[in-house]
Curated annotation (Swiss-Prot):
Intravirion-facing ranges: 38-79
Membrane topology: Single-pass type III membrane protein
Gene: E
Biological process, per Gene Ontology: disruption of cellular anatomical structure in another organism; viral budding from Golgi membrane
Cellular compartments annotated: Host Golgi apparatus membrane
Primary location group: host cell
Keywords: Apoptosis, Host Golgi apparatus, Host membrane, Membrane, Transmembrane, Transmembrane helix
Annotated GO CC locations: host cell Golgi membrane; membrane
Lineage: Viruses, Riboviria, Orthornavirae, Pisuviricota, Pisoniviricetes
Matching PROSITE patterns: COV_E
Name this polypeptide is given: Envelope small membrane protein
Amino acid sequence: MVDLFFNDTAWYIGQILVLVLFCLISLIFVVAFLATIKLCMQLCGFCNFFIISPSAYVYKRGMQLYKSYSEQVIPPTSDYLI
C-alpha cells in the first residue's frame, strides 16, 4: 500500500496551483495581445477614414471641377480679339 503524507499532497496541490496560475497568466497575456492587435486595426481604419478618404475625395472632386471647367471655358480665338 502507498503511504501519502501531507507534505506530498501539499506538493501536488502546489504544483497544480502553479500550473493553473501559469495558464491564467498566459491567457491574460494572449487576450491582451489580441486586443492590442484589434485596437491597431481599428486605428488603421480610423486613419483611412479621416486621412486617406477625405484626401481622395478632394483629389477626385478637384479633377471633376478641372475637367468641367476646361470643357466649358474655351479660350477666345484670335478673330474674337480683333
